[in-house]
């Protein structure tokens, strides 16, 4: 598969969930209707639906594609011998878990073969929940792929990616994210020698911006900072492998044409990128550490109002100015289930053991919080204003328990001594001080 030129500047459209439109050739988009009897350029009209037809209009996600050959032009899929590592859920385990970063493989591995399933909330046939993966790759994909199981949120930690999609081309690197709609065909090219990162597959309602409430009309992730690609296509009639993920399994078929043959499109079921450095961080200017929900970038609502199917939360560089306050994230037992990763630098609640590329999992009611070293320093700190810099941690927080995979519980990256970071917590209680 030809690789889109690695260094040319890409064009984007700005906004979130807009009714976008783009054409790579004049006349690719029909005027005044979606499905003309005969397209002026001889293209096929194909609707790409990300929601049911009858959802509320403000919830609807769909895009009309105008392509050289319809997606229906393919032979039967066959189950692949090689499947994603870690597909099998492990036994119930209530313990706090933490993993070191996974190494880049020595043998050639592309983005799909480099996926490792760490945890999931439910079987892939459920219309809710999430699955969490890490990836480590050292070669560009020479095939195309789509997931029928959910929307993909890709969080690079190392190495830049060029993602060729049916609707255009987008680039991301560390401190940026990409969201790919369920079912969108794409291919990942490596712009550096290798790449590593995290992936959340959202099986539930599509990701959207959180409500701002009393914050007002601006703040957190601003809509204009989300970028959607412009139409780009290739006209090639040659064999291309197409892989799909269906109910957690990989199946493959052989196309006789490029799947990236969309000459024009319009709609709002689209891929997009976002630069996490543009997040407008909100925090206290008086006392106490606010709830981490103020750091939410994107959310997928759950069945219970206010309880997310998945929240994507970041902990970016920020000023700490709270007075008379224990400033690190406080000790916590949570109804929600927290998977954390570290993109860059250090996390302010963990002095050691949590490195870039690493992960941790604290499920429902697992007690967690700053480690012993961090807590001691915070209690004794001189509370001058200071800025936390060189950091970018994130959290996938879900209302459903994340079951670790068998592989995640057996792999050498799992830290056997994670609980030890809370050993020796000093007894500082002094009833004589009352």
Curated annotation (Swiss-Prot):
Coiled coil, from the record: none
Signal peptide: none
Cofactor(s) it depends on: Fe cation
Keywords, sorted A to Z: Dioxygenase, Iron, Metal-binding, Oxidoreductase, Phenylalanine catabolism, Tyrosine catabolism
InterPro entries xrefs: HgmA_C, HgmA_N, Homogentis_dOase, Homogentis_dOase_bac, RmlC-like_jellyroll, RmlC_Cupin_sf
Binding site for homogentisate: 347, 368
UniProt keyword Kinase present: no
Gene Ontology BP terms: L-phenylalanine catabolic process; tyrosine catabolic process
Amino-acid positions noted as binding Fe cation in the UniProt annotation, renumbered to this chain: 332, 338, 368
Listed GO CC annotations: cytoplasm
PANTHER family: HOMOGENTISATE 1,2-DIOXYGENASE
Subunit structure: Hexamer; dimer of trimers.
Name of the featured protein: Homogentisate 1,2-dioxygenase
Organism: Pseudomonas syringae pv. tomato (strain ATCC BAA-871 / DC3000)
Name of encoding gene: hmgA
């Amino acid at each position: 598969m030809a690789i889109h030129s690695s260094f040319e500047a890409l064009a984007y459209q700005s906004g979130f969930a807009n009714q976008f439109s783009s054409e790579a050739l004049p006349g690719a988009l029909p005027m005044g209707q979606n499905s003309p009897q005969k397209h002026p350029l001889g293209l096929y009209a194909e609707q790409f639906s990300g929601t049911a037809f009858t959802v509320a209009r403000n919830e609807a996600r769909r895009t009309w594609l105008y392509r050289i050959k319809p997606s229906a032009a393919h032979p039967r899929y066959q189950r692949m011998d090689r499947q994603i590592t870690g597909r099998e859920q492990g036994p119930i385990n209530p313990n706090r878990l933490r993993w070191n970063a996974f190494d880049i493989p020595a043998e050639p591995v592309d983005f799909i073969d480099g996926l490792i399933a760490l945890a999931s909330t439910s079987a892939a046939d459920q219309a809710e929940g999430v699955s969490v993966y890490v990836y480590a790759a050292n070669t560009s994909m020479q095939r195309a792929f789509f997931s029928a199981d959910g929307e993909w949120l890709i969080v690079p930690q190392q190495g830049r990616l060029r993602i060729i999609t049916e609707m255009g081309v987008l680039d991301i690197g560390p401190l940026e994210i990409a969201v790919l709609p369920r079912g969108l065909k794409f291919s990942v090219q490596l712009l550096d020698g290798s790449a590593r990162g995290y992936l959340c597959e959202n099986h539930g309602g599509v990701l959207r911006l959180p409500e701002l409430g009393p914050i007002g009309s601006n703040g957190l992730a601003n809509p204009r900072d989300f970028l959607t690609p412009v139409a780009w296509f290739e006209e090639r009639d040659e064999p291309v492998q197409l892989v799909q993920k269906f109910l957690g399994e990989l199946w493959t078929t052989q196309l006789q044409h490029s799947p990236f043959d969309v000459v024009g499109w319009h709609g709002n079921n689209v891929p997009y990128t976002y630069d996490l450095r543009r997040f407008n961080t909100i925090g206290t200017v008086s006392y106490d550490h606010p709830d981490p929900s103020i750091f939410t970038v994107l959310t997928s609502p759950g069945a219970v109002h206010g309880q997310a199917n998945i929240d994507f939360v970041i902990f970016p560089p920020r000023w700490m100015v709270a007075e008379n306050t224990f400033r690190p994230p406080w000790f916590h037992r949570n109804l929600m289930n927290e998977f954390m990763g570290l993109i860059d630098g250090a996390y302010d609640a963990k002095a050691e053991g949590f490195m870039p590329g690493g992960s941790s999992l604290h499920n429902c009611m697992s007690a967690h919080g700053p480690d012993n070293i961090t807590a001691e320093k915070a209690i004794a700190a001189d509370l001058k204003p200071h800025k936390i810099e060189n950091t970018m941690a994130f959290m996938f927080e879900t209302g459903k328990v994340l079951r670790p995979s068998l592989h995640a519980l057996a792999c050498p990256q799992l830290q056997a001594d994670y609980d030890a970071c809370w050993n020796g917590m000093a007894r500082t209680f002094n009833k004589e001080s009352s």
